[in-house]
């Protein structure tokens, strides 16, 4: 398969090709050290908005690769869900499903970069209270769909704030609270996920969905979508845990502020704050276990709760994997 962008190698050359006339790449002509050179020296792309998808061709086999995390200055957890292997030996397509934190601080100057992703629909999973004053800032050609998935999320957080400040919640209790929250998301998220999958099924254009931090509701939404595509649970968990990596600087800043505030509020639970701001394999497993215990497993949940028939699921898999 030699279409789009791809790398071609023979005994003497290692060439990166592109179908974009605005992008200029280097050609490496080394033999034994070629892999080292390619990995340590990024190809020069003149068009900074262009996101290349690269077909790596070796011995007749092709693997499509791309950068998972997509950098925007104030949107820290924006990433592509593609590139994951399924239990059927397929791969989730790059550039079809995107997840992120809220887009209220997406800059107008970054609209070209956003539009380069060809996203036509954005699903906002936040509650109206969360959105107020933090509305998504989107290019005018992008459709916005408000699909709140957890109706009481704002009340949950506001109710916890005073307890955290006064040290009324232990670290273990905060983990239990998050686990219960994830169990609740499973049921509350069904209408939003149904709408999201219907759009994916009927449109060839990429979609994006997000909540506030892009980790909990967005994480479960991603886990369910990948389950529909028959990605195994450990791979789903690994993808979910990436939120801690991409949000690490933001979380570190918040924890630094919390440690300073602890001087005034000595009972403030810094560990509790960290548990609320982080992802945890235990949280997502609570959601999986809830589905297994209450709905007869993931396949039954997909069919009976999400309303996706075997034929529809096959169609979704064909559309979103290769």
Language-model features, listed with the residues they occupy:
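Ser/Thr-glycine-rich phosphate-binding loops at phosphate-binding pockets of nucleotides
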Residues: 213, 217-218
């Amino acid at each position: 398969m030699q279409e789009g962008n791809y790398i071609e190698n023979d005994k003497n050359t290692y060439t990166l090709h592109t179908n974009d006339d605005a992008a200029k790449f280097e050609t490496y002509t080394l033999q034994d050290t070629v892999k080292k050179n390619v990995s340590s020296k990024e190809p020069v792309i003149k068009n900074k908005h262009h996101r290349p998808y690269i077909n790596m061709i070796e011995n007749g086999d092709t693997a499509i690769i791309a950068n998972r995390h997509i950098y925007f200055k104030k949107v820290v957890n924006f990433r592509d869900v593609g590139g994951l292997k399924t239990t059927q030996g397929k791969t989730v397509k790059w550039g079809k499903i995107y997840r992120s934190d809220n887009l209220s601080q997406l800059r107008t100057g970054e609209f070209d970069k956003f539009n380069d992703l060809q996203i036509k629909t954005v699903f906002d999973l936040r509650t109206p209270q969360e959105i107020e004053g933090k509305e998504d800032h989107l290019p005018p050609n992008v459709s916005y769909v408000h699909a709140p998935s957890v109706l009481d999320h704002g009340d949950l957080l506001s109710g916890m704030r005073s307890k955290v400040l006064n040290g009324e919640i232990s670290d273990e209790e905060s983990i239990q609270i998050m686990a219960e929250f994830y169990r609740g998301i499973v049921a509350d998220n069904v209408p939003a996920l149904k709408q999201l999958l219907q759009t994916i099924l009927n449109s060839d254009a990429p979609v994006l969905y997000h909540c506030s931090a892009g980790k909990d509701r967005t994480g479960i939404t991603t886990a369910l979508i990948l389950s529909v595509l028959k990605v195994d649970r450990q791979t789903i968990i690994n993808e979910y845990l990436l939120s801690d990596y991409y949000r690490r600087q933001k979380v570190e800043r918040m924890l630094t502020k919390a440690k300073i505030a602890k001087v005034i509020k000595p009972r403030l639970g810094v560990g509790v704050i960290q548990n609320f701001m982080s992802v945890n394999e235990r949280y997502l497993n609570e959601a999986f276990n809830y589905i297994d215990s209450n709905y007869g497993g993931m396949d039954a949940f997909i069919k009976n709760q999400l309303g996706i028939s075997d034929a529809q699921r096959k169609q979704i898999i064909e559309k979103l994997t290769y």
